[in-house]
C-alpha cells in the first residue's frame, strides 16, 4: 500500500539521512573524532522477491552513506561513516517474516529454516559486535560493510 511505502522510506532512509545530516552539521566544529554508523541490510545489496521497498530503501541508505563518507574526506576533521549490514538477527521483524505467506514472501522457508537451525544471531551479540566495530580502527575504512565479514574482537 502507499502508506507502507511511505513508512518504509521514512524508517529506512529519511530518518537516518536526517539524523546523519543533523549530527554532521552540529558536530562539524568538534575537535574529537566523529563516527556515524547507519544500519543497513544485506537485502539492500541484492534483490529479495517481495521486498521491493525494503531492498530499495536499504540500497539508498548504503549509497547515501558512501557518498557522504566521500564528501567528508575533504573537510577539516572528517567524520567516518559506514552503512553496516548486521546479519540475520532474531528480532520482531524475523517473526513477521516467518509468519508471511509464500505468496507474499516467496523466501519464507529460508527464514523459517534459519530459526529452526539456530542460525539467527541474538540482538545482544549483534549489538556487541556493532559497538566493537564502531570503536575499532577499522571503522569507516569501507563505507558499506557487513559485520559478518569484519573481525571485531569477539
Describe each region flagged by the PLM:
Residues 22-33:
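A short helix-coil junction within the Rossmann-fold of NAD(P)-dependent oxidoreductases
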Residues 83-84, 91, 99-154:
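C-terminal helical subdomain
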Residues 41:
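Residue(s) in the substrate-gating loop at a strand-loop-helix junction
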Residues 20, 57:
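Active-site helix of classical SDR
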Residues 25, 70-74:
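Alpha-helical segment proximal to the catalytic Tyr-Lys
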Residues 47-55, 67:
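Active-site loop-to-helix junction immediately N-terminal to the catalytic Tyr of the SDR YXXXK motif
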Residues 1-6:
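Substrate-binding pocket helix/loop in short-chain dehydrogenase/reductase
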Amino acid at each position: 500500500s502507499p502508506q507502507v511505502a511511505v513508512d518504509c522510506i521514512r524508517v529506512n532512509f529519511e530518518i537516518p539521512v536526517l539524523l546523519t545530516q543533523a549530527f554532521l552539521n552540529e558536530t562539524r566544529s568538534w575537535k574529537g573524532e566523529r563516527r556515524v554508523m547507519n544500519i543497513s541490510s544485506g537485502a539492500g545489496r541484492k534483490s529479495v522477491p517481495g521486498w521491493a521497498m525494503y531492498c530499495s530503501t536499504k540500497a539508498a541508505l548504503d549509497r547515501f552513506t558512501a557518498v557522504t563518507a566521500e564528501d567528508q574526506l575533504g573537510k577539516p576533521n572528517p567524520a567516518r561513516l559506514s552503512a553496516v549490514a548486521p546479519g540475520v538477527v532474531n528480532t520482531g521483524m524475523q517473526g513477521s517474516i516467518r509468519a508471511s505467506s509464500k505468496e507474499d514472501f516467496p523466501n519464507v522457508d529460508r527464514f523459517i529454516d534459519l530459526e529452526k537451525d539456530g542460525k539467527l544471531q541474538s540482538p545482544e551479540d549483534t549489538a556487541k559486535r556493532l559497538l566493537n566495530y564502531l570503536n575499532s580502527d577499522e571503522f569507516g575504512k569501507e563505507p558499506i560493510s557487513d559485520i559478518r565479514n569484519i573481525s571485531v574482537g569477539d
